[in-house]
């Protein structure tokens, strides 16, 4: 479970929002600082499914007929793939039959009969390779292009390029697997050296969508506002001593924007509002698909 500085109501989420909100209201600032696209764009949103240890490429979209000829034989090549303990297994043929689908003739295995029906709407990139057999650096490389951490992930770059349509929700949302985090943990949705508003914010599919968004107990009327004002005064005094700090300035507004998310999040995460057709499409009412469908 990801926990972003719960002391300031999931600080990363609100820091992301607040920095963008503060900058967007400033006069005469560059377009990139406002979170708006550098160039006109066609895409409105991007969904990236990160499947660590996912299905093999040669069992899905990468048809290699020569594998059947060498099935069960040792690899006869001086170029050795990266492996654990320097052990290379025997060559194995495809376990599913491949067919060319649609007008494009895209090769898709029988493992994906429904995806095969929309073959002409797909773009398959076969030129991407990993430089490590170790899950953690390989996952970093998939998400950032580098095996070492500290670089912005794909979602952060998309957020940086497309901006955000609302100031009530973060532009980059992460829907983690309930069974656990991927190899490398929360670094896989880091903003790296990009501004803080481009860091991924986790939404849970089960239980509260965002941890610590609401107080654990009901507070007396007005006490929440009084707490925010006290915290703001403490932070302003700190700024007067230390000088301008973007991160602190962002956090000073976090409780103010928390109210917006407290109103917006319950509505956008209420799947009971979905139509019967949508529930059927995402398998929300089936035990075997409800968890993934709700994400």
Predicted segments, located by residue:
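Ligand-binding pockets and gating/stacking loops
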Residues: 1-295
């Amino acid at each position: 479970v990801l926990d972003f500085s719960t002391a300031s109501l999931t600080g990363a989420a609100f820091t992301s929002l607040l920095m963008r909100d503060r900058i967007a209201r400033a006069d005469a600032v560059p377009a990139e600082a406002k979170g708006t696209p550098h160039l006109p764009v066609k895409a409105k949103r991007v969904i990236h499914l990160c499947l660590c240890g996912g299905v093999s490429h040669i069992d899905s979209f990468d048809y290699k007929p020569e594998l059947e000829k060498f099935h069960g034989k040792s690899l006869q090549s001086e170029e050795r793939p990266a492996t654990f303990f320097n052990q290379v297994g025997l060559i194995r043929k495809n376990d599913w039959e491949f067919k060319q689908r649609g007008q494009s003739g895209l090769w898709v295995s029988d493992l994906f009969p429904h995806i095969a029906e929309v073959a002409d709407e797909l773009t398959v990139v076969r030129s991407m390779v990993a430089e490590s057999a170790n899950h953690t650096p390989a996952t970093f490389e998939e998400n950032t292009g580098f095996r070492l951490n500290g670089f912005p992930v794909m979602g952060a770059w998309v957020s940086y390029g497309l901006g955000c349509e609302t100031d009530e929700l973060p532009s980059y949302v992460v829907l983690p697997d309930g069974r656990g985090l991927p190899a490398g943990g929360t670094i896989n949705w880091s903003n790296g050296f990009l501004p803080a508003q481009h860091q991924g914010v986790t939404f849970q599919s089960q239980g509260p969508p965002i941890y610590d968004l609401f107080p654990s107990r009901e507070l007396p009327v007005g006490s929440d506002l009084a707490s925010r004002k006290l915290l703001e005064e403490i932070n302003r005094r700190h700024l007067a001593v230390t000088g301008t700090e973007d991160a602190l300035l962002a956090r000073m507004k976090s409780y103010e924007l928390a109210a917006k998310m407290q109103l917006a999040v319950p509505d956008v995460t209420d799947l009971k509002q979905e139509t019967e057709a949508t529930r059927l499409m995402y398998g929300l009412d089936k035990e075997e698909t409800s968890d993934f469908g709700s994400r």
